[in-house]
Swiss-Prot record:
Top-level lineage group: Eukaryota
Reactions listed under catalytic activity: a cholesterol ester + H2O = cholesterol + a fatty acid + H(+)
Pfam family, one: LIDHydrolase
Tagged with keyword Endoplasmic reticulum: yes
Keyword Membrane: no
Active site as annotated: S136, D270, H299
Protein name from the UniProt record: Lipid droplet-associated hydrolase
EC number: 3.1.1.13
GO MF term set: sterol ester esterase activity
């Protein structure tokens, strides 16, 4: 595998309805359709990114491009937003999904799991193997996907900064739980008022909020402007409130059943999944591939370390890919 290239990367962008919810999909590579209808030219493997929260696909734009190049442009790399976390551009045609029934609560944590499973069922052939790369709460969603759909041909699941247990008890969770569970509605009016600002002013506000970072991915700034939408922020905060209440006990049974397929990557200063969570899971699963970050990467690595993370993942998966 070669290092990340600066050459142009084919990137396809689409907005669809999945389970009745607006969904943003970014696809790296020439493959736009991986359904069974085009089985003759299908790749053997799909890399699918399950985002954190906020689950906007645009945050992972640089990451999937870097990963695609690091994989020698041999495999498609897709990222699927969480249901309702995207604001479709005005005038952009939405592709209606008529084959999948609407979920009762697609914006909640359970609904987001079913949303990803339904997306795969509709858009990816069963013959294609999967590498699931999950970030933050996406790791919880990925473990649930593997639990509920054992028929998925998952070659590997890479769980980055995994929030898979005791979220409300984490340092950040203790601060955010009261806000998310009791006071989140108070944020809607300020967001509504800010939504009327010109796009340039919104971008300036985002830059100001991220001013403490030495370098910040430009696509992260552009994507963050979407947070000035009441619909998006309501769905983001609602999902986050459910995370605090529902992500309590680690699903050690599912981890044990899939241990050989899993790679865990914990941070050293992560206030959402502190290092003692790493110490405990490492003790419980001594034979697991459970790593501790030695590079000082932040939980929200997509803000400034997408290329570095992509390079590490391609190195981790080198042996698996040579066996295909």
């Amino acid at each position: 595998m070669r290092s990340v290239s600066e050459e142009p990367v084919p990137l396809h962008e689409e907005f669809i309805y999945c389970c009745g919810a607006a969904t943003h999909v970014l696809k790296c590579g020439p493959w736009k359709d991986l359904s069974k209808d085009e089985s003759k030219n299908l790749p053997r493997l799909l890399f699918m990114i399950i985002p954190g929260n906020p689950g906007l696909a645009g945050y992972y734009r640089t990451f999937i491009k870097a990963l695609y190049c690091g994989l020698n442009q041999q495999y498609p790399v897709w990222v699927v937003s969480h249901a309702g976390h995207c604001k479709p551009p005005s005038g952009m045609e939405m592709i209606e999904d008529t084959d999948i029934k609407e979920l009762e609560d697609v914006f909640g944590l359970n609904g987001q799991v079913e949303h990803k499973l339904n997306f795969l069922k509709k858009n990816v052939s069963k013959d294609i193997k999967l590498v699931l790369i999950a970030h933050s709460i996406g790791c919880y969603i990925t473990l649930e996907m593997m639990k509920r759909a054992s028929e998925l041909q998952v070659l590997r699941s890479v769980l980055l900064f995994p929030t898979i247990e005791r979220m409300a008890q984490s340092p950040q969770g203790k601060l955010m739980t009261p806000l998310l569970c009791k006071l989140r509605y108070a944020l809607y009016m300020p967001v509504y008022l800010l939504s009327f600002l010109p796009e340039g002013v919104k971008a300036s506000l985002v830059r100001f909020a991220l001013r403490g970072m030495k370098t910040c991915d430009e696509s992260s700034i552009t994507t963050s402007v979407n947070l000035f939408s009441v619909d998006c922020i309501a769905n983001i905060l609602y999902m986050a409130s459910q995370e605090m209440m529902k992500v309590v006990e680690r699903d050690s049974t599912t981890i044990k059943q899939n241990l050989k397929k899993l790679i865990f990557y914990y941070g050293t200063g992560d206030s959402w999944c502190p290092q003692n969570y790493y110490d405990e899971i490492k003790m419980d699963f001594p034979d697991g591939d459970i790593r501790l970050c030695e590079k000082g990467l932040r939980h929200a690595f997509v803000l400034d370390a997408s290329k570095e993370m992509a390079a590490m993942i391609t190195d981790w998966l080198r042996d698996d890919l040579t066996k295909l």
